[in-house]
Structure formats: C-alpha cells, structure tokens
C-alpha cells in the first residue's frame, strides 16, 4: 500500500507495535535517525512520515539549533508534498509547535499506563496507553482535539496530520531498551521499573491490538 518513514531521535527508539501495525496493513517502513550528527532525511518515495519520541523538549533553544529546526523544516516539506504525519509523544509536540501551538512543562506528568477520553467523535480507544512525558501541548486554534487525560492533550489532528501524546509503539522490549539506555534515570513518584515492566508485559497483547486500531483510525483519516 505504501512506504512509511519513521524518524527516531535515540538509538533505543524503535517503531515497535506501530511499525508492526503498518506492516499488517500492507506498508513497508524505513527507520532513520534525526539528531545533531545525522543528515536530514529525504522524503522522496514515502507516503507517510512518523516522528517518534525524544527525551528533549521542543522549546529547548539548544535542541532547536542542533537539529529540531531541521525537523521543523522537514515537516514543512512534508506539508508541501501532501505527506501526512503521525507524531508520537515528542512527535506530537513537534506537530503542535509546527502548526502554531505551544508546548510547556506539565504540572501533571504521566509515566505508566493511563486511560484517555475521546472527544469530537474520534475513534481513539480509551486504552490504557503507555505514557512517558513531562511536557504537554497547548493546541493551536485550528487543531481538533481527539482525546485527553486530566493532565494533557492526548490526541489531536490538524488537517491530515495526527499527534498522540501516548506511546502506542511500546511493548515490553521497547520499555526495557529505554530503561537500559538510562540506567541512572528513573522518574520519581511513579511505579518502579520492575512494576512498569511487569504491567507492560501484561498489557502488550492488548496494546498490539490497540496499535492496529490506531493505525486504522489514522489511515481512515488521511484518505477521508
């Protein structure tokens, strides 16, 4: 059906369940890095752009100077080509910023599995979805809210572009990779690593189905 370009910002980030869902729907994908040392990728030959998460913040001026400015420009190129974007966590915040919204430090960060509430007739399922974020989006006027939690916007669209604050790609392997990459970092006031891994192992079979449903919602939206 087409080809998807996934952009990651850390080597331990992978398409995971979302990559599997696109494959199940007949797509192929490629995964490239976007950071200060990586060249800006070409969009030629792709039908969908997916921007994964990052530990960084879109409002960090040093990050923008190092590589995020190029990512914003790439999003502009995608818009010119009519290439729909799916933004995940940092990717959703990048979309929010690109479309004129604001991203700010959240007073209610979320780490773990959370339910979300759908809005405006969206078909985003309640979850639970895996969350790992400390920032939140303040949407631009032209955005349509698709889902929220008490602490954050959880899903939205602007035209054919869709952002989700949660991590639909996460399974137990992905979460373990994140933890192994940051052995000295763990958020305070949340469940322990072992507890999060155990819950993620329990949730992964259902999360796989939810990821497929999310890709179906996205694909239906971009061809509507």
Q: Where do the language-model regions lie?
A:
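Amide-donor transfer/coupling interface in amidating biosynthetic enzymes
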Residues: 6, 104, 118-224
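Extreme N-terminal starter segment of soluble prokaryotic enzymes
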Residues: 1-5
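Short, electropositive alpha-helical surface patch
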Residues: 103-110
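Flexible gly/pro-rich beta->alpha loop and the following alpha-helix that scaffold active-site loops
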Residues: 23-86
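Catalytic nucleophile loop
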Residues: 77-102
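Cofactor-binding loop segments of dinucleotide-utilizing enzymes, especially the Rossmann-like FAD-
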Residues: 7-9, 34, 90
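Short N-terminal binding/cap micro-motifs at the start of the first secondary-structure element
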Residues: 12-17
């Amino acid at each position: 059906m087409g080809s998807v370009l996934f952009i990651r910002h850390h080597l331990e980030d992978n398409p995971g369940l979302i990559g599997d869902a696109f494959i199940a729907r007949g797509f192929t994908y490629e995964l490239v890095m976007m950071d200060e040392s990586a060249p800006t990728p070409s969009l030629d030959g792709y039908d969908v752009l997916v921007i994964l998460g990052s530990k960084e913040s879109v409002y960090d001026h040093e990050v923008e100077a190092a590589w995020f400015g190029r990512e914003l420009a790439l999003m502009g190129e995608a818009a010119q080509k009519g290439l729909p974007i799916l933004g995940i966590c940092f990717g959703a915040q990048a979309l929010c910023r690109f479309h004129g919204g604001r991203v700010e430090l959240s007073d209610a960060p979320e780490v773990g599995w959370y339910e979300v509430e759908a809005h405006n007739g969206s078909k985003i399922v309640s979850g639970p979805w895996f969350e790992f974020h400390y920032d939140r989006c303040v949407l631009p006027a032209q955005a349509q809210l698709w889902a929220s939690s008490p602490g954050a916007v959880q899903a939205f669209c602007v035209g054919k572009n869709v952002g989700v604050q949660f991590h639909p790609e996460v399974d137990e392997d992905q979460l373990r990779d994140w933890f192994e990459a940051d052995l000295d970092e763990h958020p305070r006031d949340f469940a322990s690593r072992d507890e999060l891994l155990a819950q993620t192992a329990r949730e992964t079979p259902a999360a796989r189905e939810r990821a497929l449903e999310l890709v179906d919602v996205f694909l239906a939206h971009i061809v509507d």
